Design a protein with these regions (language model features):
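Conserved acid/base catalytic micro-environments in cytosolic active-site loops
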Residues: 1-197
Length: 197
């Protein structure tokens, strides 16, 4: 795997994501992992629609799924998702349970990905009414990766993006089109650098 972008959003971020994922070229290499802080039913319906309009393969991430380039994996907040090494590859460890504290679902996915892939990770936060994702962005930055947020002006709910925007002095002013462009640039820049688990 050469590069992974982890995107976090709340239930108010679907419209933002619809402007980003379809704009990406699967030839850019690497994978996209998305954590949506919404119910699994809503996320599954959204994934079916997004897969139909994208060049990327868009799927619901499952436990044991091997991370593959040119794919977009989407998870709901009812899952605790960690990326882990397995037999020279990276796989998802997904634990679904109503008893899991899902207040840090985005953080968990970002932190586990950054700890494995170091500077080959970008973290992105979109619209959301929750504060999840801030710790994940911090970990990605500390490992040498890149972190971006959607300009709060483009967010229906600004809580998820406004805190990190101030705290980490992140590159602001990015709308969905610019975010898609930055994500592609990160992936293309690392396309030839493959890392194994």
């Amino acid at each position: 795997m050469n590069f992974v972008t982890v995107i976090g959003l709340g239930e108010s971020g679907y419209a933002n994501l619809l402007k980003i994922i379809p704009a990406l070229n699967p030839d850019m290499g690497g994978a996209i992992c998305v954590m949506v802080l919404d119910s699994s039913d809503h996320v599954e319906s959204f994934v079916k629609y997004l897969d139909a309009i994208c060049d990327f393969e868009v799927t619901i991430g499952q436990n044991g799924t091997t991370l593959e380039g040119g794919s977009c994996y989407i998870f709901s907040a009812s899952d605790q998702v960690l990326l882990s090494p397995y037999s020279g590859h990276y796989t998802f460890k997904v634990r679904s349970s109503e008893k899991i504290d899902n207040s840090e679902s985005i953080d968990d996915l970002m932190v586990s990905t950054a700890s494995l892939l170091k500077n080959r990770v970008a973290g992105v936060l979109l619209s959301g009414s929750q504060t999840d994702g801030s710790k994940g962005l911090e970990m990605i930055l500390s490992e040498g990766g890149s972190s971006y947020i959607l300009n709060p002006e483009y967010c229906l709910h600004k809580t998820m993006t406004s805190g990190p925007f101030v705290r980490y002095n992140l590159q602001g002013g990015l709308d969905e089109t610019k975010l898609a462009s930055v994500i592609q640039q990160c992936h293309y820049a690392n396309k030839e650098n493959v890392i194994t688990a």
